[in-house]
């Protein structure tokens, strides 16, 4: 095998390696010196596991790792040559940050370039319902520190507000920050099974649906409540219940009126959303396609309110000097009970267009407010960064 990455965390080290077809498993060895005695840390059965975390180590100490693959046949085991020795030092890891990344308080936020330039903030934002995005200064990813999390999706689920993020450097797993729905205070972090860009997320009343690259995955809402009741600073989700491909790439997702809408973001041409019924058989969910809807290029998020109005963020690039730059909010009125003969839902004309700050990633509706999440504060090229989830009263749109 080839070790693709090694990383030190709090009293732990994690390794990633390439999957090797045809082997029976892997052996991982470690030592406190490069030329010292190596101890077997873990024997892994099967070739599909490509990650290992060694815990219980001393803090602020360098450890050395090497590994082999092995094949077992007719009771005999053959072990490969050792990989190159790689090292990592354990480090202290701070708690996940709760405060805003750039603007520490209301006064500083209202002095920001974005607030001064965009009426979406100065005229439409309800500051008391808006809140700082956690984890942008630091996220404790199961004992490893990430300062490069990009916030992507937001949805309301039960008594919680969920915010997803992925590590832009690819060093750590993606996460969901769990916040109290009413107070918007950060509670804990759920660490996801992989590093996929979790660009969208939805809640159907039983399960959390999430993008996994070009697939859709889901896991039970009970994983959220378990993470909260554990009282820990983080919990880990070992695996999704199920994931599968759909008719489109998965960049946009929302749940409304018993329909899970899934769509792709196309940065140069219009695209489609597909509306699916969720069918449960033998305790597993399946998706049955029933609707389509055309969406503009560069659509990043969609949400519906209880009256059937649809809100859509269309956003691309960090500033207006970039090709194809846009950052808008559109409002439409739909009749979801009147698809055409091709089962296409027609949007009609825009009822409202609002110019937004750059990098509007996603939206959700809860109560009488629309919540818009931004990632601009994580990009140095963004001249008008927003480090908040911005609440806008629906009646103002």
Place the predicted regions along the sequence by residue.
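Extracellular low-complexity, O-glycosylation-prone stalks/linkers
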Residues: 22-42, 66
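Beta-strand-rich domains and repeat architectures in extracellular enzymes and scaffolds
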Residues: 134-171
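Loop/turn-rich, solvent-exposed surfaces of beta-rich toroidal or solenoidal domains
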Residues: 293-341
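Extracellular fibronectin type III
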Residues: 72-95
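Conserved aromatic anchor
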Residues: 11-23
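Beta-strand-rich modules
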Residues: 54-76
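Sequence/structural signature of beta-propeller modules
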Residues: 92-142, 393-397
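Repeated scaffold domains used in trafficking and secretory/extracellular systems
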Residues: 146-153, 195-202, 243-255, 296-304, ...
């Amino acid at each position: 095998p080839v070790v693709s990455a090694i990383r030190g965390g709090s009293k732990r080290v994690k390794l990633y390696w390439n999957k090797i077809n045809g082997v029976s498993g892997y052996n991982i060895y470690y030592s406190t010196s490069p030329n010292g005695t190596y101890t077997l840390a873990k024997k892994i059965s099967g070739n599909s596991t490509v990650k290992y975390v060694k815990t219980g180590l001393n803090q602020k100490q360098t450890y050395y790792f090497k590994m082999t693959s092995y094949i077992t046949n007719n009771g005999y085991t053959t072990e490969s040559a050792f990989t190159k020795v790689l090292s990592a030092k354990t480090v202290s890891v701070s708690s996940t940050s709760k405060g805003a990344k750039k603007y520490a308080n209301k006064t500083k936020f209202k002095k920001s370039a974005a607030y001064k330039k965009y009426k979406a903030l100065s005229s439409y934002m309800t500051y008391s319902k808006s809140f700082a995005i956690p984890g942008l200064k630091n996220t404790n990813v199961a004992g490893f520190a990430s300062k490069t999390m990009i916030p992507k999706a937001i949805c309301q689920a039960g008594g919680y507000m969920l915010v997803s993020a992925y590590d832009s450097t690819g060093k750590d797993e993606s996460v969901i920050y769990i916040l109290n729905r009413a107070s918007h205070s950060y509670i804990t972090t759920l660490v996801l099974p992989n590093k996929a860009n979790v660009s969208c997320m939805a809640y159907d009343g039983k399960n959390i649906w999430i993008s996994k690259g070009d697939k859709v995955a889901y896991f039970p809402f009970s994983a959220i409540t378990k993470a909260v009741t554990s009282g820990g600073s983080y919990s880990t989700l070992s695996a999704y219940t199920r994931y599968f491909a759909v008719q489109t790439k998965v960049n946009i997702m929302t749940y409304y009126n018993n329909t899970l809408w899934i769509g792709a973001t196309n940065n140069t041409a219009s695209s489609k959303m597909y509306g699916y019924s969720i069918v449960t058989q033998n305790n597993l969910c399946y998706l049955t396609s029933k609707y389509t809807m055309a969406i503009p290029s560069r659509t990043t998020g969609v949400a519906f309110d209880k009256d059937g109005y649809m809100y859509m963020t269309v956003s691309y690039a960090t500033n207006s000097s970039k090709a194809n730059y846009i950052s808008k909010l559109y409002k439409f009125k739909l009749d979801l009970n009147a698809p055409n003969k091709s089962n296409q839902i027609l949007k009609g004309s825009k009822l409202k267009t609002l110019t937004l700050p750059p990098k509007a990633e996603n939206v959700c509706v809860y109560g009488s407010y629309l919540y818009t999440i931004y990632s601009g504060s994580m990009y140095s090229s963004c001249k008008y960064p927003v480090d908040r989830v911005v609440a806008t009263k629906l009646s103002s749109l």
